[in-house]
Swiss-Prot record:
Residues 23-254 form the AB hydrolase-1 domain. It is an enzyme of class 3 (hydrolase). Belongs to the AB hydrolase superfamily. This is AB hydrolase superfamily protein YisY. It comes from the Bacteria. Coiled coil: none annotated. GO terms for cellular component: membrane. Pfam families: Abhydrolase_1. One of its GO terms (molecular function) is hydrolase activity. Its EC number is 3.-.-.-. The active site is at S96, D220, H248. Keywords: Hydrolase.
Amino acid sequence: MGHYIKTEEHVTLFVEDIGHGRPIIFLHGWPLNHKMFEYQMNELPKRGFRFIGVDLRGYGQSDRPWEGYDYDTMADDVKAVIYTLQLENAILAGFSMGGAIAIRYMARHEGADVDKLILLSAAAPAFTKRPGYPYGMRKQDIDDMIELFKADRPKTLADLGKQFFEKKVSPELRQWFLNLMLEASSYGTIHSGIALRDEDLRKELAAIKVPTLILHGRKDRIAPFDFAKELKRGIKQSELVPFANSGHGAFYEEKEKINSLIAQFSNS
């Protein structure tokens, strides 16, 4: 079933809620929505889990305010979802930008009602290069991408989508993926890009006190595998599982293995 959850005045998020059992909250990446987790949504309820897919503000079926795309506000939105649905002992799973927002939630809200964390191809601890952190894109690369969004968003997103998958996927799946990205608000996409460019979570990793599973493709061209190694180094109770032949789209390329790992970790 679907919920519309008010997180602040004039902002309501859409949340897909399927199945019964221990809740796993999925936070999507940039600029996607909860439907990207279709292959987890189809499987995890059969294994006794409650799938909760959040459309972050500006994405999917959620409201599209002009502002509030910083990680603090996004994390507060997640807190409102957890509170409204009265979730306890939840597993929080974030993909790419969603992984970064999950980390901010754990630090900002002290991991309230979350017992375990899953970081899937996370765009964290920082998405762009900075002193002491030579990984990821340059900030100028994000600025250039934003200008391309303003000029021709569909083509720019299509080009971005080509970098997601390391293995060959069908043209139809690529088109489906592009359609998900085009559902996002244009200004929300840009504002989230600014957050990805500027946010730095390195000092917040020590605040994560729960068991954490890090799943990351070694051939990720969007969130390099070095990100995963930095997360492993900074989060005490963490386990890193690399996917040797997958890119950023490991959630699809390795869906059977990832679903099994999520279920095993969530049941442990």
